[in-house]
Swiss-Prot record:
Residue ranges that the Swiss-Prot or TrEMBL entry lists as coiled coil: none
Gene Ontology biological process terms in this record: tRNA wobble position uridine thiolation
Similarity remark: Belongs to the MnmA/TRMU family.
Domain of life: Bacteria
This protein's name: tRNA-specific 2-thiouridylase MnmA
Provenance organism: Flavobacterium psychrophilum (strain ATCC 49511 / DSM 21280 / CIP 103535 / JIP02/86)
InterPro entries with a match to the protein in the record: MnmA-like, MnmA-like_C, MnmA-like_central, MnmA-like_central_sf, Rossmann-like_a/b/a_fold
Entry-linked Gene3D superfamilies: Adenine nucleotide alpha hydrolases-like domains, HUPs, Translation factors
Stated role: Catalyzes the 2-thiolation of uridine at the wobble position (U34) of tRNA, leading to the formation of s(2)U34.
Localization annotation: Cytoplasm
GO cellular component: cytoplasm
Length: 395
């Protein structure tokens, strides 16, 4: 009998995942990850992990499966929290959920599970795993979940073949309402529980407050750039090569105070991200102000009025070679190659038509239509059909 360790998070999805595996005849073990216990860094006044681990325990008891808690808070601190702080310091905006899956759930946690004699690790993610043969060897596919509203394959966009080989996603074929229905039918305590929000496993994080504990406030100016500014009317140059054109399209505009007017003050450019409109506290504009650029060197924030402001849009983005990740290495591009894909630059964004261009220095993702708020440090994922084949960090 194959043994599966399920990452029981205390939510309804992983609870039902454990039940389904049991029904399929696996020997199931429930393992709860505790990822946070540093009381010196308060992340929010509600620390849900106690309640969550208790719910996970109740689910395990109900299903009659062994249950253990494993404390990964030190690894979480090193691999996720410290990384987040260093990225924010550089003015980038990291995605903790993608990192948590790559570094914790499918790495540290998976190794613990395998050491318990598990054949597989299962989670409550809304995605599916496929298997095909390439050159006589098995190749694993990361496929979108059946529930369009809940597809979570994006969060797993950094997984490797080795990790996928050992993974199971029991609820990927179901919709959220179906999962709740099963939980209600078998009377799981988590049946009505609300979906967890926020930083993978730490509960609700108020980011600026969380960041302030390491990144000190530093007053700076908020500038507004008019949508009709000449900076947006650069002559379309005749480029010598496709690469030159893409580099131009992916480049961030370097704003200076000369092209803008001061409209307010902020407490630190590193707390803000492109596309953000909350937390600026600047009134009196005809339309809402959106952040179009932050500069941590000069501690300046540049904004524009309205969600259609030209400063928000770019047609291409760049990923450096060491931050390109192919879930399907057999599909990886070599220098000079291109491929048509569908891509997204954030969770739950509708997939966008795009072309990947691989050059010696890295990969360009060129979109058919300009994209709003392409953000450094976030992940771009690329897909063919319902398969996620690769991803990279936006540079």
């Amino acid at each position: 009998m194959k043994r599966v360790v399920v990452g029981l998070s205390g939510g309804v999805d992983s609870s039902v995942a454990a039940y389904l595996l049991q029904e399929q005849g696996y020997e199931v073990i429930g393992l709860f990850m505790k990822n946070w216990h540093d009381d010196s860094v308060t992340i929010s006044n509600e620390c849900p992990w106690l309640e969550d681990s208790n719910d996970a325990l109740l689910v395990a008891e109900k299903l009659g499966i062994p249950f253990q808690t494993v404390d990964l808070s030190q690894q979480y601190q090193e691999k996720i929290v410290d990384y987040m702080f260093s990225e924010y310091k550089k003015g980038r905006t990291p995605n903790p959920d993608v990192l948590c899956n790559r570094e914790i759930k499918f790495d540290v946690f998976m190794k613990i599970a395998l050491s318990l004699g598990a054949d597989y690790v299962a989670t409550g993610h809304y995605c599916r795993k496929g298997e095909i043969e390439v050159d006589g060897k098995p190749v694993y596919q990361l496929l979108a979940g059946v529930d369009d509203n809940k597809d979570q394959s994006y969060f797993l966009c950094q997984l490797s073949q080795e990790q996928l080989a050992k993974s199971l996603f029991p609820i990927g074929e179901l919709t959220k309402p179906q999962v709740r229905e099963i939980a209600t039918k078998i009377e799981l305590v988590t049946a009505e529980k609300k979906d967890s929000q926020g930083l993978c496993f730490i509960g609700k994080v108020r980011l600026p407050e969380f960041l302030q504990q390491q990144l000190k406030p530093k007053e700076g100016l908020i500038f507004e750039v008019d949508a009709t500014n000449q900076i947006y009317n650069q002559e379309k140059i005749n480029f010598d090569s496709v690469q030159e054109k893409l580099a131009f399209e992916a480049k961030d505009i370097q704003y200076t105070p000369e092209v803008a007017k001061v409209v307010g003050k902020h407490q630190g450019a590193h707390y803000f991200t492109i596309g953000q409109r909350k937390g600026l506290n600047v009134g009196g504009t005809k339309e809402a102000l959106f952040i179009i650029s932050t500069n941590v060197e000069t501690n300046a924030i540049y904004t524009g009025q309205g969600h259609k402001h030209p400063g928000l849009f770019k047609k291409a983005l760049f990923v450096t070679n060491d931050e390109i990740h192919w879930i399907r290495p057999d599909l990886a591009l070599t220098n000079g190659q291109t491929i048509q894909v569908m891509a997204r630059i954030r969770y739950r964004q509708e997939l966008q038509k795009a072309t990947l261009h691989q050059f010696e220095n890295g990969l360009y993702v060129e979109f058919e239509t300009p994209q709003s708020a392409i953000t450094q440090g976030q992940f771009v994922s690329w897909h063919i059909g319902d398969e996620l084949i690769g991803s990279g960090v936006i540079s």
